[in-house]
From Swiss-Prot:
Residues spanning the membrane: 76-97, 102-124, 307-328, 365-382, 926-945, 960-979, 1010-1032, 1046-1068, 1075-1095, 1113-1137
Function noted in UniProt: Involved in transport of phospholipids.
Signal peptide bounds: none
GO molecular function: ATP binding; ATP hydrolysis activity; ATPase-coupled intramembrane lipid transporter activity; magnesium ion binding
Subcellular location(s) per record: Membrane
Protein name: Putative phospholipid-transporting ATPase 9
UniProt family annotation: Belongs to the cation transport ATPase (P-type) (TC 3.A.3) family. Type IV subfamily.
SUPFAM superfamilies: Calcium ATPase, transduction domain A (SSF81653), Calcium ATPase, transmembrane domain M (SSF81665), HAD-like (SSF56784), Metal cation-transporting ATPase, ATP-binding domain N (SSF81660)
InterPro entries: ATPase_P-typ_cyto_dom_N, ATPase_P-typ_P_site, ATPase_P-typ_TM_dom_sf, ATPase_P-typ_transduc_dom_A_sf, HAD-like_sf, HAD_sf, P-type_ATPase_IV, P-type_ATPase_N
Coiled-coil residues: none
């Protein structure tokens, strides 16, 4: 077994320290230095979980609960959650008051609708929590082998584990808690771990236990085993772990290399032994399971204001009515006789007692508040939740946003922000993996001052297209001009990750080059300085590489293709097959890995210290140019000038560059370094990282330059077209990238973010004054001068814009300048400049800066922001934005797990916003407006009837008519509108992207439109009430000669309202489906069915509605004629207004509908008329780009 394990290990082994979830160390690095104040109080007695010392610590058990409720707390807690909503609380108060004599209706009719709405939501909450409970039980009852204390292991449930337990986890099992790895089935205590449940990554990580515990590979070895661990307190940082283990009187440092996280899985390893360090809710995965930031859409926030406005209206009407009622009641008694004798004051000592009119007015106020509660739509919240869930399903099922290659559909991870997708003003995008494929290809390099590689990048092709001529590449060495045809340019490399072509160094020809020794060191560094795992296919014996980043894979593949094949790795060695410069033969060389100084976004470099077979010590380093050039020795700068020029050329071509350098170490220097780095790593304190950084700074210096690499990260398919279409929609696009400024600018041109003849405002600190200060000045002086310089450049930029004459501008700013631009006293001036530009590119941006820029844009202009990214370094930006969109690419799933919506490719953003965003915004906006319209139409008739009856608190309708209006007779059509309505089809949404501005400018949910719908409700109620009253008043209603009473008038008005609100819905719908026809007409049919069946019930149940339809309304011709006349008269004003609006001042979607109706959608002239009609000249967005393009054409015309 051990022999087989060793064989597998040789195929897959890697430096485990670098493979403990390092992909996101950058964004958590700062938090690590702040862990818990003192933060290192956890003490673990390994193999002694029941010792008195361990018991006194009172650490949490391993039972995990993710439910919101327990059986005891479900009812009170869920009710509390429901009644936190103001509307629900209002209906609760009116429901309670319905049990008092003050109620104008029966208590049951008031409570049943509330119970229906609250009950539906509680059932949903209960089902969801029950599912969570089932999942919790499944996890907590899993079994794992635990040491009994006598050298044997028994299976126990996860929930019974205690701190200090020794557990045995076998292949393909999940780790039950956070463990310190002690040993494994491999001799050197390594194991393979899959972290899919933590970060979504499928590539395996390798962990390794301490050498001192690696021999504990049998169960009986743990009899008598004792160890003492002191480590950091529980925290949410997945990527750090600091601690020490005391064993046999010696202390050993612990790091993420030894930490096995709960819910990750053991793979390709037969078993491991580990000590439980964190349990239950102290484990890092549970610490990370807090809810994401709560986000609410702008429409939802505005809806709350409308609810408050409706409350104010209800209170106002109740107050007016109670005052009038009080005055009338006071004047009711004249000469001992009651004017309104039918109110029977003798039966009620308070309500209608003229002697106590103020008290009667107060009681009337409470009654009126209950009666007018129908102004507030009780089913609004539930209906919106249902609609949003169904909208999300449509987004998830959209075949046009399904990425077949990776089998990844779009996924709305929350339905709260659907309508917000239709109001995005600014998009803030990452570049690598978001705009690009994050699939790196080694294409060029500079070695010893000589440029190699003749590949042509997409950016170079775009530059050629901008200049309008053929693409010409000039070789440095041969001065040969080569014009590449389209076929040659697009020819794909036969080796993934390698698109390098240059016969001077391929096929071993590098040995004849002038600086062959430098070339050898260059590619040897690529073959050795990395964290890649080699894998051997047992059938073909071909080696493939598993790397944490595509850059690393590209470097190793390039080294292999050029004669330096990395083929094996152990914990302490790397094996490379390479061409010997002296003998000319391929030889196998073994490099002993002594130390690894890992890469992170702060260091921007990675180094390894290796020992060659002859004992020579080498430090091999690769990193970003801005940190590497300053670390070169005086004698190591021989090729610096040429390399800098080449790096700038590569950046112009849109390539990602790294500088390669090395130095030889003497044994004494290395010995001192190794002692200091070991001491720093052994430190158990919050400044451990800074101590390590301090030590590495002293060794990574005096380097000798070898050259630079250049890899291409190609744009994703459809990115330029998508950006162009989003710009046409008037959406501003910012790109936040860690690339060099030159690279970012040229990528901007390649992806249509920048246009030729767009003027550029560039803000950076590469000025002679600042550079001279950096060499001689102090930090405070440099910072002050830099800040003043940035402010000056921002002000100059604003001046340029002011006198630009309408020219389009692009703002480009680097990371150093951005740090000062985000200071509190400058950031608002910077924002004013940025939002006035057509495009903004922030270069060399850190993850923190991305989040700060997003926060600034969101809070600064008050409009909706959308952030899109694919990596862990984008998480802060995604959570800060109003909407976070994660790209499910190749950098793991952390961005997706922190996002609101996930898509597989950037190009799908076009359809997500312009189609689904526009539809959802329109649907939700119209739905909310209609909800308030139909409730005002219904509720205001109650007020008018109250006025007609001198505010006697008598409702116009039967109790159950009141209760079921919002539930059965008017709710389904509005839900159907929210799910299915389309003002224009998806095709025309994309063809006329400016339609999207209706959402950005909030045209469909402005106060003007909201108040317009409210006014529609008020005048509809007035028309219905007065026409019905006038038509029925003082005349015989049927053949018996009876005049209509409350039941007849109320039944007639109610019928008219049901017809009006449902036909109003039909007039508001733009796109009819069979479902909409069914729900509209069925709502009317259900009303007639209900009034018939309800009226047949005994009179003690149906009260005034007893046989009112069958015996009074239906037989009467006037009832049907009045219904027809009132419905037509009520809807006619809206119909006339819509016709006039469409004819004389159509909205943008109306113009598109007219084009479609007239069949002119394919006529370019008509389409241009429609497009231009909605465009206002501006210096941002599409019109600015269009003007830049036109000027470019005009400028080039004389030359042609």
């Amino acid at each position: 077994m051990v022999g087989g394990g060793t064989k597998r290990r040789r195929r897959r082994l890697q430096l485990s320290k670098l493979y403990t979830l390092t992909c996101a160390q950058a964004c958590f690095k700062q938090d690590h230095s702040q862990i818990g104040g003192p933060g290192f109080s956890r003490v673990v007695y390994c193999n002694e979980p029941d010792s008195p010392e361990a018991d006194s610590r009172n650490y949490s058990d391993n039972y995990v609960r993710t439910t919101k409720y327990t059986l005891a707390t479900f009812l009170p807690k869920s009710l509390f959650e429901q009644f936190r909503r103001v509307a629900n609380f209002y209906f609760l108060v009116t429901g309670v008051l319905a049990f008092t004599p003050l109620a104008p209706y029966t208590a049951s009719s008031a409570i049943v609708p509330l119970l229906f709405v609250i009950g539906a939501t509680m059932v949903k909450e209960g089902v969801e929590d029950w599912r969570r409970q089932k999942q919790d039980n499944e996890v907590n009852n899993r079994k794992v082998k635990v040491h009994r204390g006598d050298g044997s292991f028994d299976a126990k449930e996860w929930k019974t584990l205690s701190i200090g337990d020794i557990v045995k986890v076998e292949k393909n099992e999940f780790f039950p808690a956070d463990l310190v790895l002690l040993s494994s089935s491999y001799e050197d205590a390594i194991c393979y771990v899959e972290t899919m449940n933590l970060d979504g990554e499928t590539n395996l990580k390798v962990k390794q236990g301490l050498e001192v515990t690696s021999s504990l590979r049998d169960e009986f070895n743990f009899k008598g085993f004792e160890a003492f661990v002191k480590c950091e307190d529980p925290n949410a940082n997945l990527y750090s772990f600091v601690g020490t283990m005391e064993l046999k009187g010696a202390k050993y440092p612990l790091s993420p290399q030894q930490l096995l996280l709960r819910d990750s899985k053991l793979r390709n390893t037969d078993f491991i032994f580990g000590a439980v360090i964190f349990t239950g809710h102290d484990t890092k995965v549970i610490q990370n399971s807090t809810d994401p930031p709560s986000k609410r859409s702008m429409i939802e926030k505005k809806m709350d204001k409308i609810i408050y406005l409706m409350f104010f209206m209800v209170i106002t009407m109740a107050f007016i009515g109670s005052v009038i009622f009080g005055v009338t009641t006071r004047d009711d008694l004249k000469d001992g006789v009651m004017k309104r004798w039918y109110l029977r004051p003798d039966s009620s000592s308070i309500f209608f007692d003229p002697k106590r009119a103020p008290v009667a007015a107060i009681y009337h106020f409470l009654t009126a508040v209950m009666l007018y509660s129908y102004f507030i739509p009780i089913s609004l919240y539930v209906s919106i939740e249902i609609v949003k869930v169904l909208q999300s399903i449509f987004i998830n099922q959209d075949i046009h946003m399904y990425y077949e290659e990776a089998d990844k559909p779009a996924r709305a991870r929350t339905s709260n922000l659907n309508e917000e997708l239709g109001q995005v003003d600014t998009i803030l995008s990452d570049k690598t993996g978001t705009l690009t494929c994050n699939s790196m290809e080694f294409i060029k390099c500079s070695v010893a001052g000589t440029a190699y590689g003749r590949g042509v990048t997409e950016v170079e092709m775009a530059m050629g297209r901008r200049k309008g001529g053929p693409l010409v590449f000039q070789s440095d060495e041969n001065d040969i001009d080569m014009e590449y045809s389209k076929e040659a340019i697009t020819e794909e490399s036969t080796v993934k990750g390698f698109n390098f072509r240059d016969e001077r160094i391929m096929n071993g020809n590098w040995v004849t080059e002038t600086h062959a020794d430098v070339i050898q060191k260059f590619f040897r560094l690529l073959a050795v300085c990395h964290t890649v795992i080699p894998e051997v296919d047992e059938d073909t014996e071909k080696i493939s590489y598993e790397a944490e980043s595509p850059d690393e894979a590209a470097f190793v593949i390039a080294a292999r293709e050029l004669g330096f094949e990395f083929f094996n790795r152990t914990q302490t060695t790397i094996s490379v097959r390479e061409l010997d410069l002296v003998s000319g033969k391929r030889v196998e060389r073994l490099y002993k890995v002594l130390n690894v100084l890992e890469f992170n976004s702060t260091r921007k470099r990675m180094s390894v210290i290796v020992q060659e077979e002859d004992g020579k010590l080498l430090l091999l380093c690769k990193g970003a140019d801005n940190v590497m050039f300053e670390r070169l020795s005086k004698n190591g700068r021989e090729f610096e000038e040429e390399t800098r020029d080449h790096v700038n050329e590569y950046a112009d071509a849109g390539l990602r560059t790294l500088i390669l350098a090395y130095r030889e170490l003497d044994e004494k220097e290395y010995k001192v370094f190794n002692e200091r780095i070991s001491e720093a790593k052994s430190s158990v304190s919050a400044d451990r990282e800074s101590l390590i950084e301090e030590v590495t700074e002293k060794i990574e210096k005096d380097l000798i330059l070898l050259g630079a690499t250049a890899v291409e990260d190609k744009l994703q398919n459809g990115v330029p077209d998508c950006i162009d279409k989003l710009a046409q929609a008037g959406i501003k696009i910012w790109v936040l990238t860690g690339d060099k400024m030159e690279t970012a600018i040229n990528i901007g041109f390649a992806c249509s973010l920048l246009r030729q003849d767009m003027k550029q405002i560039i803000i950076n600190l590469e000025t002679p004054e600042i550079q001279s200060l950096e060499k001689t000045g102090e930090k405070d002086v440099i910072a002050k001068a830099s800040k003043e310089n940035v402010l000056s450049q921002i002000i100059n930029g604003k001046t340029q814009l002011k006198y630009s004459g309408g020219n389009a501008f692009a703002l480009i700013i680097d990371g150093k300048s951005l740090a000062y631009a985000l200071d509190d006293d400058i950031k608002h001036i910077f924002l004013e400049l940025a939002v006035s530009c057509a495009s903004v590119i922030c270069c060399r941006s850190s993850p923190k800066q991305k989040a700060l820029v997003t926060r600034l844009v969101k809070s600064g202009n008050g409009k909706t922001t959308l952030a899109i990214g694919d990596g862990a370094n984008d998480v802060g930006m995604l959570q800060e934005a109003d909407i976070g969109v994660g790209i499910s690419g190749v950098e793991g799933m952390q961005a997706v797990m922190s996002s609101d919506i996930a898509i597989a490719q950037f190009r799908y953003l076009e359809r997500l916003l312009l189609v689904h965003g526009h539809w959802c915004y329109r649907r939700i906006s119209t739905m909310i407006c209609y909800f308030f319209y139909k409730n005002i139409t219904f509720g205001f008739t109650l007020f008018l009837y109250e006025t007609y009856t001198t505010f006697s608190s008598t409702p116009a309708y039967n109790d159950w008519f009141l209760s079921l209006y919002n539930v059965f007779f008017s709710s389904l059509p509005v839900i159907a509108l929210g799910v299915f309505d389309q003002d224009v089809s998806a095709r025309y949404c994309l063809k006329f992207p400016l339609l999207y501005q209706e959402g950005v400018q909030n045209v469909l949910f402005s106060w003007r439109r909201i108040l317009g719908w409210m006014f529609n409700g008020f005048y509809s109620a007035v028309i219905i009430f007065f026409l019905c009253k006038s038509s029925l008043q003082s005349q015989a209603f049927n053949h018996d000669g009876k005049t209509p009473g409350r039941e007849i008038l109320g039944g007639t008005m109610y019928t008219c309202i049901v017809w009006v609100v449902n036909l109003q819905m039909a007039l508001a719908i733009s796109y009819f489906t069979l479902i909409q026809h069914i729900v509209i007409w069925s709502s009317i049919v259900v009303w007639y069915f209900f009034i018939t069946v309800y009226g047949e019930l005994p009179s003690r149940i149906s009260t005034g509605a007893y046989k009112v339809f069958v015996e009074a309304l239906a037989p009467s011709l006037s009832y049907w004629l009045i219904t027809l006349f009132v419905v037509v008269a009520t809807l006619m004003p809206y119909f006339i207004y819509s016709a006039l609006q469409m004819s004389f001042f159509p909205m943008y979607h109306g113009m598109i509908q007219w084009l479609r109706y007239e069949g002119q959608c394919n006529d370019p002239e008509y389409c241009d008329i429609v497009r231009q009609r909605s465009i206002r000249p501006t210096t941002v967005g599409f019109t600015a780009r269009l003007e830049a393009k036109k000027r470019s054409v005009r400028i080039s015309e004389p030359a042609s």
